[in-house]
Amino acid sequence: MSYNPYDNVLATVENAANILGYKPAEYEAVKYPERELSVSVPVRMDDGSVKVFKGYRVQHSTVRGPAKGGIRYHQNVNLDEVKALSAWMTFKCAVADIPYGGGKGGVVVDPTTLSDGEKQRLTRRFTSMISPIIGPDKDIPAPDVGTNAEVMGWIMDTYSMLNGHSTPAVVTGKPIALGGSEGRNEATGRGIMLNTLYICQKLGIDIKAATVTIQGMGNVGSVTAKLLNKEGAKIVAVSDVSGGIYNGNGLNIHAILEYLSVKGNLLSGYNEDGMKRISNEELLTLDTTILIPAALENQINKDNADKIKAKVIVEGANGPTTIEADEILDKKGVVLVPDILANSGGVIVSYFEWVQNLQSFEWTEEEVNSKLARKMSKAFENVYGIAKEKNVSLRTGAYLIALKSVVDTTKLRGIWP
């Protein structure tokens, strides 16, 4: 039986609702996305042929504000995954206390097989097909797996052309020249770094004496590695789609990042003295202080959770741990900082970008990072506090805060008509 990430969401919501003592009628609407859009996207390829790609945009909730969430290009995108990711965005925005609901989008495509022209034509056609339901006050996309600032620029331009005026606030994570925010590119990784420092402080772990392993060296993983390395942590293992590398004495993160900055380079081609090659699976079970899964969903599951030796897990990816794995880790005493808290730095700074666009105003990188640290610290303390008070995991604590916020707002708004 295949794993359905949306079942994970429903189980977590039910658990939080039971602890909060909610009646089913109070949270029933939260269990279902408000809107699911499926589109078939025809694209003329460079060889003159036409390929049709499947695309989705799901708006889970707009109770607290416009839907907010990324667009991913990946060959394994499916509707259940997009639904789960959109729900996680609803709860992530509520935990961070920013005025958004949750949305997510995706196209079933391996972006590495597309030329730049094909990717641009796909993006523009997909944008035109979802344009009726997106907009600065409706639904604001952002980058995700397989997309980046350049793709956001194409979305912004297409939407602006369709509407007859420049609309930078329709997406976040744009290039700076198109209204992007300083600090946005590093925001998710910076948030993970901050949450790692916060939890280490609570547990009495000296970050300079800690060993760290990071699964995934895309934007999130590489920024996290860079910033934790700067804080003095010893990063002993990292990985990407081509596999992982390990050095018990600490990897040369600066050299790795320089190597990976060259387009097309993967870790399988990297070498340094004292390192050995490991698989992604081996990386997850290394004896380490802190494990940061920053790749895709469902990486830590019932099959490997019992083998995990890390004392702390900080979730860089969305949904990297299944419900069954959560229970196993909890029994083992592993402290886990959940995705909807740990990786919310990206959406917090996306909110800052949106605000700057709407006000035609610019903040410096120092201002953005300072505001992010304040928001993140408050969110962490809120989650840590309620988890201690209710004697529950940090994930459950985060969902208690998020669900209460969404349900309270729903009660204030009422259900129309």
Predicted segments, located by residue:
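Flexible, glycine/charged-enriched surface loops at secondary-structure junctions
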Residues: 23-29, 97, 135-143, 166-169, ...
